[in-house]
Amino acid sequence: VSKLFSVKDLEETRPGSKESKALTADWLQGEITICLTDEVRNEINLNPDQLKRQRGRDFALRFPTLVSPHEEVDNNLNALKLLLPKRPRRGDEADIRHLAHAIAGRAQFFVTRDSALLRRADEVRDRFGLSIVRPSELIVRIDELVREAEYQPTRVAGSLIRIGRVPSQQESDIVETFAQSENRSDFQQRLRAFLVEPQQVEASIVRDPDQHLLALLVYDRRTNHRLEIPIFRVADSYLGKSLTSHLILQTVLVAADERRATIKLSDPHLSESVERALQTGPFVRIGNSWIKFNLRTLETTTSLVIRLKSFEADTVEEREYLRAMIQTTTQSLLAKEARALLEVERALWPMKIVDLDIPIFIVPIKPEWAMHLFEKKMAEQTLFGAKPEIALNRENVYYRAAKPRVLSAPARILWYVSSSKKYQGAMHIRACSLIDEVTIGTPKDLSRQFRRLGIYEWKDILGIAKGHIDNQLMAVRFSDTELLNTPVPWKDLQHILAQVEGHRSQIQSPLHISNESFARIYSRGVQL
C-alpha cells in the first residue's frame, strides 16, 4: 500500500507532478494500492476556494481512504514530534500528521517529493517501519521485482565492464557523476521523468569492475518507428573514447533489431567527445539533435531507393537529408560507383546492399583472437573476459600471413571461428565486418603502424611471421563488426557453399564468395 503525499501531485499540472502521476500507470495497478489519509481530506476541506475544494473532493473519491485508528494516530503524533526541528518550517506539523495516519494505517510506503521529509526517511523507517520514498524510487523498486532479470548487469563486449538498468537508490551518484553543463536539479528532474516510465523508457548505467560509473544512457521507445536517446553521458576515463563508440554502435544495432528506422539522439548537453564519435557513427546533425536512419535488411540498389522513399521523416530537414541520399544512391547506381554506394550503406548500417560491387570473403580466425576482437559470447566463457581497450574499439586489426594475397579493401568479411575444444560455439560463422585497409609489411613496421589496434602483442605478430622479422605479413584493418544473432554452423555453411559456389571448402585461408552466398549466410545469421 502506498500513500500519496499530496493530492495536488496528481490533480494539477505543475513542476514535478508528472513523477507522481506516473504512479497511476496501468501496469502498476496490480502492484500497489494508492490510498489517501483523513489528513488529505482535511486539507481539501480547509481550502478557501470553493471551486478548488469541490474539485479536490471529486478527485479524492477516486482513491480509498486508509483506515487509521485515532488513538494510534495520536500516539504516533507524539512520537513524531520529537523528529521536528527546533524551528519547524511551515507545513512541518501537517507533514507529521500525514505520517501519523500512514503509520497507523499500516501503509508500507509514504510517497512524497518533499525533500525535508525524504531527509528523515532513515529515522522514520528505523523507528516506525514506514518507508518514505520518492515516486520515481518506488516505481524503480517495483519494476526491479517485476523484471528482475533485466536489472542484472551483463558484460559489455565480453569484458568485465557491465551494463544494466538503473537500480533503485542510485540517483544521487548518477547525478553527481553525469550532470554536465546543466543545472543539477534540472538534470535530476529529467532523469526522474524517465525512471518513472520503465515500461517504455530504459535507463541504463555502465560500471567498471570496481563499480565506478562509466556511462549513462536512456532509450525512449514511446514512438514506434524511432529510438530516441534523450540522455547519453560518458564519464572521463581511459576507456571513454572507445566506450562511447561502442555504445553508439550498440544503440544502432538495438534500433535495427527492433525494426526502428530512425535514431534520434536529443541530449542537449552532449560532450565534445560524444559529438565527435557521432559524426563517425555516422549520425548527422539535424536541428538540435543527431539523427541516423538505419535498416535491418538486405537491399538491391534499386529496392533501396524505394525503401528510402517510404521512410518516415519528422522534420523538413530530415526529408531533405533523405532526398539527398536517394539522389546519391541513384547517381551512384547509374555511374556504377561502388565506393559511393558503400558510403550510403555505411550511413544506413547495418543494412547491406547485396549487389554492391566489392569483394566478399570468409576469413578463418582462432577463438582466442575472436574473443578479444569481437566475439563477446566466447569472451564470457572466460574468467577475465575480453580486454576492454580492444573489445570496445569500433575498428580493429587482424594479422595473417601475406600469402595468399586474396584480401583487399574495401571488402566484406564473414568471420569463421575455427575449431576449438576449449570454447563453445566454434566452427560457426559468427560475425560480419567491413575491411577498411589491407597493408603488407614486416612485423616491426606493421606493429608500429597499428600499435593502438588489435589484441596482438609483438610475440604474437612475430609468431605469425614464423620468427623471422623480415617475413612479410598482412594487417587487415576492419570496422563496423556485427555479431550474427544466430551463428551459422559448419554444416549449414558447407551446404550453402555447395549449392551456390558449386564446391565445399575447409576454410583454411580466406575464401572469396559470391554476393548470393553472402546474402544466404547473412540472412540466416540475422534471421531476415
Regions found by a protein language model. Give the residues of each.
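A conserved beta-strand-loop-helix scaffold within acyl/acetyltransferase catalytic domains
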Residues: 182-227, 231-234
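Conserved acetyl-CoA-binding loop-helix of GNAT-fold acetyltransferases
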Residues: 239-256
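Acidic, PIN/NYN-like endoribonuclease modules and their adjacent C-terminal/linker elements
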Residues: 11, 109, 115-188, 192-195, ...
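Contiguous surface segments at macromolecular interaction interfaces
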Residues: 261, 276-389, 427, 438-528
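Active-site neighborhoods of divalent-metal-dependent phosphate/nucleic-acid chemistry enzymes
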Residues: 66-111, 115
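A short, internal acetyl-CoA/4′-phosphopantetheine-binding micro-motif in the GNAT/acyltransferase core
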Residues: 230-243, 268-269
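Short, well-structured N-terminal submotif of metal-dependent ribonuclease cores
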Residues: 1-36, 46-54, 115
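Conserved GNAT acetyl-CoA-binding A-motif
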Residues: 255-269, 289
